């Protein structure tokens, strides 16, 4: 989905060990943390649509074409022999790989001791082959007691920079931190109140997210696919399916060990350079953790469908959806932190800690 060459052949063609390692990190010849700039000679700029669409396809052609699953999350767009566009479900496009993954999930479900986790693994294994992820997303939200967490499948659409329609495959294996999760649990009860307190017109907060949403902390032990490309994700808000969000809410997963590593090795050195000395006392892990957490909480708030009923907000915003959604989450997260500080529900630190 991200690169058109065979992975093993591509990496073996790079003689310099450090460059080869950098290419493996980026899942291709483009620097993902520098605007997808090519760092190997012989490669052009990365296609905005990655491998989801034909490289020679223009937006105008796509807009006027008529074919099934045109804006599908779980399909590739191809050309037929006559040059016409058509879609191929992931379950067909990656059939051999998904059959292997599905079989492994079934075997894992037989070993699972937690019944809800067993059910999720079974449904997810079926979803990989049916291309219908709704039932398994619902089952994932129903899991509450599993100490091991698996997030797997086509999930985020950031890789599709052309339209933001299509999701890329990824996987996480996580271990739940029970002590930290208990500390975070109290915030879930405030989500309906936070939704109603949004500083916007009533029409933009009429949709009430499911009250079954939860906040949990985890240690991540494995990344693969999109979540492992370029940088490492430190927090997740899932599922992305608007139907699940409205019925079940979302789960906010805070990847504590990854967050700690980012704070110690990246954020603090940057702060020591950019932040004036008298403000550095406000650089705290608690504030960093909370800002990240409420950023993810903010993804689940607001409306998911357009006011005129024409479709989803994500579909209407197209390729701009991801950037606007991330900006919304940043600002709304700080708004919620301030509200909870004023209520006395957050007791760690000062408002300056969270803003600095």
Predicted regions and their residues:
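N-terminal helix-rich structural modules
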Residues: 1-112, 116-120
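Contiguous, non-catalytic segments that form substrate-binding/exosite surfaces or channel walls
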Residues: 87-280, 284
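An active-site-proximal "capping" alpha-helix that borders the catalytic cofactor pocket
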Residues: 114, 322-339
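Active-site-adjacent bridging/hinge elements
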Residues: 263-274, 296, 300-312
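Secondary-structure capping and boundary motifs in well-ordered enzyme cores
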Residues: 281-290, 321-328, 348-356
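Active-site recognition of the HExxH zinc-binding catalytic motif
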Residues: 290-304, 329-330, 334
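Post-HEXXH active-site segment of zinc metalloproteases
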Residues: 303-327
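Long, well-structured alpha-helical subdomains associated
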Residues: 334-356
């Amino acid at each position: 989905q991200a690169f058109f060459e065979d992975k093993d052949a591509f990496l073996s063609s790079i003689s310099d060990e450090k460059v080869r390692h950098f290419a493996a990190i980026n899942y291709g010849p483009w620097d993902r943390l520098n605007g997808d700039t090519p760092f190997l000679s012989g490669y052009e700029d990365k296609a905005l649509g990655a491998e989801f669409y034909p490289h020679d396809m223009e937006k105008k052609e796509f807009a006027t074409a008529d074919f099934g699953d045109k804006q599908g999350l779980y399909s590739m767009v191809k050309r037929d022999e006559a040059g016409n566009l058509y879609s191929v479900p992931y379950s067909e496009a990656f059939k051999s790989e998904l059959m292997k993954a599905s079989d492994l999930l079934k075997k894992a479900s037989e070993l699972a001791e937690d019944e809800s986790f067993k059910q999720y693994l079974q449904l997810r294994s079926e979803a990989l082959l049916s291309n219908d992820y709704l039932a398994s997303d619902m089952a994932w939200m129903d899991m509450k007691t599993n100490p091991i967490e698996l997030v797997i499948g086509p999930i985020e659409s950031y890789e599709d920079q052309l339209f933001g329609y299509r999701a890329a495959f990824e996987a996480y294996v996580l271990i739940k931190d029970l002590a930290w999760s208990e500390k975070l649990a109290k915030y879930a009860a405030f989500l309906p109140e936070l939704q109603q307190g949004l500083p916007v017109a009533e029409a933009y907060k009429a949709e009430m997210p499911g009250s079954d949403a939860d906040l949990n902390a985890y240690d991540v032990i494995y990344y693969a696919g999109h979540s492992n490309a370029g940088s490492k994700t430190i927090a997740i808000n899932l599922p992305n399916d608007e139907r699940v969000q409205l019925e079940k809410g979302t789960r906010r997963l805070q990847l504590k060990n990854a967050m700690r590593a980012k704070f110690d090795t990246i954020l603090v050195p940057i702060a020591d350079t950019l932040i004036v000395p008298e403000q550095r006392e406000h650089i705290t892990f608690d504030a960093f953790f909370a800002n990240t957490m409420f950023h993810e909480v903010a993804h689940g708030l607001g409306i998911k469908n357009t006011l005129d009923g024409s479709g989803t907000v994500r579909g209407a915003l197209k390729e701009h959806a991801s950037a606007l959604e991330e900006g919304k989450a940043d600002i709304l997260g700080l708004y919620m932190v301030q509200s909870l500080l004023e209520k006395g529900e957050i007791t760690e630190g000062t408002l300056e800690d969270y803003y600095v």
